[in-house]
Amino acid sequence: MGIDPNYRQNRQVVGEHEGHKIYGPVEPPGKLGIHGTIVGVDFDVCIADGSCINACPVNVFQWFDTPGHPASEKKADPINEKACIFCMACVNVCPVAAIDVKPP
């Protein structure tokens, strides 16, 4: 199952990381929540195949280590989400539908 496209309304903001919001629940290392508001990445769905990082023309994502997470031990973190040009390349290439993009 991919990211909940309504997470911005359905989940509570539980923190901030590298300038973007984190939506819970968060219980490390097994549950890491959704990172980002403009470009949201469900860290609990992401398998870190790198397709979004390679597809993004404006370098929205950066690798973030998540040791002990069952899906993968690194994630594509949307640390530069404000640079997003809404081309949807990342959404289209993600094999597990872990990304949701919504203009502010």
From Swiss-Prot:
Region of interest (N-terminal extension), residue spans: 2-37
Start and end residues of each 4Fe-4S ferredoxin-type domain: 38-66, 75-104
Keyword Repeat: yes
Residues reported in the UniProt entry to bind [3Fe-4S] cluster: C46, C52, C94
GO molecular function term, any single one: zinc ion binding
Residues involved in [4Fe-4S] cluster binding: C56, C84, C87, C90
Binding site for Zn(2+): H17, H20, H35, D77
Superkingdom assignment: Archaea
Cofactor note: Binds 1 [3Fe-4S] cluster.
Keyword Transcription regulation: no
Keyword terms of this UniProt record: 3Fe-4S, 4Fe-4S, Electron transport, Iron, Iron-sulfur, Metal-binding, Repeat, Transport, Zinc
Pfam family, one: Fer4_10
InterPro entries: 4Fe4S_Fe-S-bd, 4Fe4S_Fe_S_CS, Fd_Zn-bd, Fe-S_Ferredoxin
Ranges annotated as spanning the membrane: none
Cystine bridges: none
Cofactor: [3Fe-4S] cluster; [4Fe-4S] cluster; Zn(2+)
SUPFAM superfamilies associated with the record: 4Fe-4S ferredoxins
Purpose of the protein: Ferredoxins are iron-sulfur proteins that transfer electrons in a wide variety of metabolic reactions.
Protein name: Zinc-containing ferredoxin-2
Provenance organism: Sulfurisphaera tokodaii (strain DSM 16993 / JCM 10545 / NBRC 100140 / 7) (Sulfolobus tokodaii)
